[in-house]
């Protein structure tokens, strides 16, 4: 499967990344939102909140976005870069895994960015609100060059992405302005950016908007179609590659 830039491929990211390695293709930046490691706990009851939680958990299960990823995927990400330069979304349970791999094993520097959700679901029975998601930024020779104070902030505040989630049909869509900041801070025009878990294509749209090249891998065909729909809206036609 020869891989070309500025295309989205419907395949398992492990297969896609190995093919990039086989072809000798290196990437300058990886921004990705892999599956979170989370238990399949569904609330009982008949309240609107319970119904909404069950619906969201069902969506995550259907898309297999609750199983986490193994270090095999992380090893491939490292092999694809001359300098480690990776943003990876995660939940609190995964932080230890990623720090062990990137910091202990590969001696990376790291920063923790936070997406603070201003309208998180009001569920706090025997727990704190689930009102944030983490982005771990690992680098070893990678570029971190915020242009201004605002770009250097580590906390991004916004509401849940309800409009885009409904429009594009992906359960874990991320805010485009947040991704744009990462692309601006850690790459240059013409660089090649990879998202091995492309989802609805937010990283790819941000890359194209900022004159970066991109490659995306996504295992679900329906989300590959959404990626291409979004890219067509912004930048013209792109083909789907299987």
Residue ranges, per PLM feature:
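Short, conserved SAM-binding/catalytic segment
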Residues: 1-4, 228-242
């Amino acid at each position: 499967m020869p891989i070309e830039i500025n295309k989205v491929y419907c395949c398992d990211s492990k297969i896609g990344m190995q093919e990039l390695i086989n072809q000798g293709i290196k990437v300058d930046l990886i921004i990705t939102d892999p599956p979170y490691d989370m238990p399949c706990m569904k609330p009982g009851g008949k309240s609107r909140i319970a119904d909404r939680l069950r619906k969201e958990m069902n969506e995550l299960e259907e898309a297999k976005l609750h199983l986490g990823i193994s270090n095999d995927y992380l090893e491939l990400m490292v092999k694809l870069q001359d300098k480690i330069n990776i943003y990876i979304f995660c939940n609190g349970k995964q932080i230890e895994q990623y720090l062990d791999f990137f910091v202990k094993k590969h001696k990376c520097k790291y920063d923790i960015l936070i997406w603070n959700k201003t309208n998180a679901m009001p569920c706090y029975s025997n727990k704190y609100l689930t009102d944030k998601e983490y982005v771990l930024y690992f680098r070893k020779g990678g570029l971190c060059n915020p242009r201004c104070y605002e770009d250097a902030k580590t906390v991004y505040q916004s509401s849940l992405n309800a409009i885009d989630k409904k429009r594009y049909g992906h359960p874990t869509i991320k805010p485009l302005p947040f991704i744009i900041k990462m692309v601006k801070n850690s790459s240059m025009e013409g660089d090649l950016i990879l998202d091995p878990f492309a989802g609805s294509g937010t990283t790819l749209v941000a890359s194209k908007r900022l004159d970066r090249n991109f490659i995306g891998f996504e295992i679900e065909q329906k989300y590959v179609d959404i990626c291409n729909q979004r890219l067509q809206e912004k930048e013209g036609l792109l083909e789907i590659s299987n």
